[in-house]
A protein has these predicted regions:
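Helix-loop-helix "hinge/cap" segment bordering the ligand-binding cleft or interdomain interface
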Residues: 1-32, 43-88, 149-155, 163, ...
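Extracytoplasmic/secreted envelope proteins and their assembly/folding machinery
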Residues: 3-6, 70, 74, 94, ...
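Short, glycine-/small- and polar/acidic-enriched structural segments
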Residues: 21-43, 108-111, 126-131
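Short, solvent-exposed loop/beta-turn-alpha elements that line the ligand-binding surface or hinge
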Residues: 39-65, 117, 123, 128-135, ...
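Glycine-rich, aromatic-lined ligand/substrate-binding cores of catalytic
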Residues: 74-78, 93-192
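Conserved small-residue motifs centered on glycine
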Residues: 156-269, 273-275
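Histidine-centered catalytic/metal-binding microenvironments
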Residues: 270-311
């Protein structure tokens, strides 16, 4: 009962902001909706990630699921669970956690999130899964290392990439900083803080999932020693989108995507933060999306999905 937990926190600790944004400017509940659709790298249209509707493309913001999240966001905002001015804040979630001024946030998780967030915030963070794990093309294509065609030293750039995927020492440096100053090997294969250092004083922090092949480096002492095996299980047991591997070519609808994005920028953070009655706001939102060319985008995506599935 997440609602009951948040109510208890608000009653017991009125000095805290119960929830803060997971991402600056994205709204409070964006991540509560993130796993419903495979958005096919658009954040505009997509297919149901669980495969329940096959390869049918939808305007994701006209779905019942989006309305449900909008209603929940509005309800929680009315109950005072959200930090004030959540859509215009510039501080990160880690800043609020470090200051001890909030209870938590709704964000994406994976094995090791507890360690990642604890290190970056200096707090002992607890992670509670509230949705199922799904995998779509955006999950694997959204964060890639590339070598620009105009690189002055492509061979050296490739050598760096090769190093961070094959060299354990490079992984540990990127993950945890300088050995002896920022971390020590507390036992075989496991790193921790040196004596006198903690998450608030350490000289280096990083989003550990961004650094290439983390599985060749040290685990962190707050994670299970088999954290990398847990990653493998996590990935293998996720529900895979029926459009996994499909990439949408937006060339034919660039004008519509620009217009639709302007509407998204106007409404999504506001709706995800419960700052407008969803019964009125979502209807107006979708009316403006249609006027901006949403249906053309959906139709183009459907055409490409049909061609892709026929290959």
């Amino acid at each position: 009962d997440v609602d009951g937990l948040l109510a208890q926190v608000k009653e017991t600790h009125p000095e805290l902001d119960v929830l803060v944004p997971a991402e600056v400017g994205a709204g409070m509940m964006k991540n509560a909706f993130a796993g419903t659709f495979d958005i096919l790298q658009t954040n505009i249209a997509g297919v149901y990630a669980d495969g329940s509707q096959g390869l049918t493309a939808y305007n994701i913001y006209a779905s019942d699921e989006f309305m449900d999240v909008a209603k929940l966001a509005y309800d929680w905002n009315q109950k005072g669970y959200y930090i004030a001015d959540s859509t215009t804040l510039t501080d990160t979630r880690q800043t609020f956690l470090k200051a001890g001024s909030c209870f938590g946030y709704v964000g994406p998780i994976h094995p090791g999130t507890k360690t990642q967030e604890s290190i970056n915030s200096g707090c002992d963070v607890t992670v509670i899964p509230i949705t199922d794990c799904v995998t779509g093309t955006s999950n694997v294509a959204g964060f890639q290392y590339t070598i620009p065609t105009g690189s002055d030293a492509p061979e050296k750039a490739l050598a760096v990439l090769n190093m961070i995927y094959t060299n354990p020492a490079a992984q540990n440096l990127l993950h945890y900083g300088i050995e002896g100053s920022d971390y020590v090997e507390v036992r075989d294969g496991v790193a921790g803080y040196p004596e006198g250092v903690d998450g608030t004083t350490v000289g280096w922090t990083n989003e550990t999932w961004l650094t290439g092949n983390g599985s060749i480096g040290l685990a962190w002492e707050t994670d299970p020693d088999n954290i990398w095996a847990q990653y493998e299980e996590f990935n293998n047991n996720a529900t895979f989108s029926p459009a996994y591997g499909f990439t949408f070519d937006s060339a034919n609808v660039k004008t519509e995507i620009t217009a639709v994005q302007n509407v998204l920028d106007k409404y999504t953070a506001m709706i995800y933060s419960g700052m407008a009655d969803p019964e009125e706001a979502v209807a107006q939102f979708n009316s403006e999306l249609e006027a901006a060319g949403m249906q053309n985008i959906v139709d183009e995506m459907q055409s490409q999905l049909d061609a892709w599935s026929a290959e």
